[in-house]
């Protein structure tokens, strides 16, 4: 079975013995994840903006329809 305590001790020893190698490895592992996170955040922001624009357009259209119906009645 996987021993978490032994693994954690190994990581701490590695970081203590070779801090620059450890930090380089951590940065190399995390950089792609940060890039993916940034890309997905940007994509989500664009989707939210598009949805808000569409909702605003629909709301404006509905308001104009109501105004036109009121004007017809008068």
From Swiss-Prot:
<feature type="region of interest" description="Disordered">
    <location>
        <begin position="53"/>
        <end position="74"/>
    </location>
</feature>
<feature type="transmembrane region" description="Helical">
    <location>
        <begin position="20"/>
        <end position="40"/>
    </location>
</feature>
<comment type="similarity">
    <text>Belongs to the SMIM15 family.</text>
</comment>
<feature type="compositionally biased region" description="Basic residues">
    <location>
        <begin position="56"/>
        <end position="74"/>
    </location>
</feature>
<keyword id="KW-0812">Transmembrane</keyword>
<keyword id="KW-1133">Transmembrane helix</keyword>
<dbReference type="Pfam" id="PF15086">
    <property type="entry name" value="UPF0542"/>
</dbReference>
<keyword id="KW-0472">Membrane</keyword>
<dbReference type="InterPro" id="IPR027877">
    <property type="entry name" value="Smim15"/>
</dbReference>
<protein>
    <recommendedName>
        <fullName>Small integral membrane protein 15</fullName>
    </recommendedName>
</protein>
<feature type="coiled-coil region">
    <location>
        <begin position="48"/>
        <end position="74"/>
    </location>
</feature>
<keyword id="KW-0175">Coiled coil</keyword>
<dbReference type="GO" id="GO:0016020">
    <property type="term" value="C:membrane"/>
</dbReference>
């Amino acid at each position: 079975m996987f021993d978490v305590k032994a693994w954690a001790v190994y990581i701490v020893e590695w970081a203590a013995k070779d801090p620059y190698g450890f930090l380089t490895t951590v940065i190399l592992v995390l950089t792609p994840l940060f890039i993916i996170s940034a890309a997905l955040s940007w994509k989500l922001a664009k989707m939210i903006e598009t949805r808000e624009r569409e909702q605003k357009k629909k709301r404006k259209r509905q308001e104009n329809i109501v105004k036109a119906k009121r004007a017809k009645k008068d």
